Amino acid sequence: EIIEKSGVSSSRFQNIFRAKDGVLTELVQFMFENQFSMARSAASVKLPPVYVYAVETAIQMTLTELNENLREIYLEAYTQKEACEYIQKETAKELYQIFGSYQPELTERDFYELEIGSAGIMRGYMAHPCDAELTLEKKLRLFFTMSLRAYNVPEEEIGRVIRFVEGLDIRTISEQ
């Protein structure tokens, strides 16, 4: 489908991206860059960085609920070695900036190791489609509670972050 819409031959496409894994990694890089900028816009510069994290992860999870093709891409990205490594390394840099003040004794490497776990939580929720009991809103609350506790965010602030995201039209933001 990508080859067809791009208007190039499959051999030229392969030369550009080397392989399916190269295409996935390029796509992941593009999506990663755009999601954090969208999240920064939605969270506003006046709010603490933890809100940017919450909006960014909410966008990812919401996208997988709105589009099965995107669910497959995200799941593959969190599974395929090169793409997953890119996600974890780049996310660790963001996490260090966002959560470093909550755990000043931790290094960027420590946040990389924490990201391995939080990425697993994210992938788990992405892999399980919402249903009548596990709604998107419930998924987001559970994810924020688990991940923000791992980053040592105080309980009161976790509650404020959850209420903030619940006040957003995350589906509309995700579709932009």
Where are these regions (language model features)?
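Contiguous, function-dense segments enriched for cysteine-driven chemistry
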Residues: F32, F36
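Amphipathic alpha-helical packing segments from all-alpha helical-bundle domains
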Residues: E76-C130, L134, K138-T145
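Short, hydrophobic secondary-structure boundary micro-motifs
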Residues: R71-E76, E157-R160
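Hydrophobic alpha-helical connector segments
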Residues: E26, S37-E72, T79-Q80, Q88-A92
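Phosphate/oxyanion-binding loops and surfaces in catalytic or ligand/nucleic-acid-binding neighborhoods
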Residues: L63, N67, I121, R149-P154
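C-terminal peripheral helix-coil segments that are non-catalytic and often amphipathic
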Residues: Q97-S101, D131-Q176
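Helix-turn-helix
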Residues: E1-G22, E26
